[in-house]
Amino acid sequence: FLGWTVLLVPFQIVLIAFRIPLAKRMPMIWHRGVCRMFRFRLELHGRLSRERPTLFVCNHTSYLDIVVLGAVLPGSFIAKVEVRGWPLFGLLARLQRTVFVERRAARTAQHRDEMTARLEDGDNLILFPEGTSNDGNRVLPFKSAFFGMAEKNIDGRPLKVQPVSVAYTRLDGIPIGRRLRPLFAWYGDMDLAPHLWSVAGMGRSGMTVQFHDVVTVEQFGSRKALAAHCENVISQGVSDAISGRLRPARRRRWWPTKPLYADKGRRPSRSGAA
């Protein structure tokens, strides 16, 4: 892990300094390498949005979501400002051009303007609207304030929003239940280092990622209605994945090189199931 990180970080620093377009792709390469090291096997359903910019809206179980989603979603994460100061991971977040936000309501408008500016530059953003992580067996209520940027047109067009659900479903090829799923979760007052060490020794892990239908705020009339829709779709997606109701995807990858074509013959239903 450290060797892979030390190898790529200098390249990313140079790419960002000289504004070379590859800087937007390098984080995805790093995440895919980490997936391979930790033996994460990703099962992909649905079709990834080709539109730029797109706001990807995702559920949040653990810091592992960053690695899993970073391997398949071309974009920058939106994270709490405290992450900026984390040893090593704060540096990695900055090198992925993460947008850091504070939880204070007084800064909401400022953060919304910053995120809108990034979208206007053509950057995709990845949002965790729950505002925190959980045990992986459910989806917490979405905070509609995070969807304020979706109310603004980007280059004269409504912003594309794609709900994406991620669920931790297998360990060494065997489906896991409610009691084991929290092994992947990181929430509350859990320490990072012991949890990361535990994950590294768990064996081959399976994650299910579903790309749901792309929507815009115009379809729902308000950011609150859009947030409610995304919450319902993602909740259903997680439920389908952890209960085994999803038909196995045609493609499982250690190194998900072509997520745009994953599970090519199927599209998510309106209910959110793939």
Regions found by a protein language model. Name each.
Residues F1-E43, A241, A249, R253-A274:
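N-terminal membrane-anchoring alpha-helices
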